[in-house]
Amino acid sequence: MLFTEIYLDRYFRDPDALLAAINEQIDRYNEDKPEADQIAKLDDSAESWSQLNKLAFWMATGSGKTLLMHANILQYQHYLARPDNHEVHRGRKLNRILLLTPNEGLSQQHLREFEAAGIDAEIFNKDGRGLFAGKSVEILEVTKLKEEMGDKTVAIDAFEGNNLVLVDEGHRGTSGGQDGAWLKARNALCEDGFSFEYSATFQQAVSGNAGLTDLYAKSILFNYSYRYFYGDGFGKDYQILNLDDDTQAQHLELYLVACLLTFYQQQRLYREHEAEFRPFNIEKPLWIFVGGSVTQTLANRDASDIVEILKFLARYVSNRNGKR
């Protein structure tokens, strides 16, 4: 929040000075880097504010992205209304506050969280603009943004003006590069306004794409990705075993027994100390099996793995006396 406060103060007060300061930092970063790893500077001969109106927050799941989003809305509204802003910002009115999500389930989740926070919000309705547009947050799935209006889609150019655009998991859809459909939509929506993006996995999204890497290198204001989140004592302990087929076949039973014993240990610890865990919001332990397929039709390998796990559990629950 403090970084956002400093950035918005400088962005609204003197965008030219902010651009110059960022370019100085890029120069320092590039000093000891090979050319292939250097970051392109911002264009100091072009309009400054339009190169600075996109911020991103790289934050691990569970680290408070939603709470930060709520605070960012209030911060932006505060600085937009300041009377001593630079002339390019002075007196500008907010057209809409838009939250883009990847799916309807997440839209509904955000709606509930806005309600709990006391922030006016609604699911976007293309057939009518509410009286509180610009004050109420309008939530819309990014998949419904198209070039032209349709039965279940809305044209991007319907959102003209000074919009504040919030994007949850902004990297989704960036696989097409900087010219991908999603990035074009994001850029169009905040062309005369501002955008905040929030994601846990920017690194995976930009991997292998020099253009996206350069873009987000200049727009990520805060990096609290999982390595830092975990290093501060949050998140889950995990271990990844990459087993080839032969090793897995030979040791699957041993591996599942070890997992079962670990799960029992966690359950027992929780049962005996539940009252002590309650202040930390720790829930009852859960054992999850994750397959590689997310489609309705499971791949043969996934189906086979699931059957093996179910057979193991069936043997366990039907053999309480320990007989083979």
Could you tell me what each predicted segment is?
Residues 1-58:
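Conserved pre-motif I regulatory segment
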Residues 3-9, 66-90:
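Walker A/P-loop NTP-binding motif
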Residues 48, 91, 131-136, 270-324:
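Conserved C-terminal RecA-like helicase domain
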Residues 56-58, 98, 288:
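Short hydrophobic/aromatic beta-strand immediately N-terminal to the Walker A/P-loop
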Residues 61:
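The conserved Walker
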Residues 67-68, 83, 87-116:
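Conserved Walker A/P-loop ATP-binding site and its immediately adjacent core
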Residues 69-80, 139, 143-271, 287:
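Signature of the SF2 helicase/ATPase Hel1-core->accessory helical subdomain module
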Residues 117-150:
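Inter-Walker segment of RecA-like/P-loop motor cores
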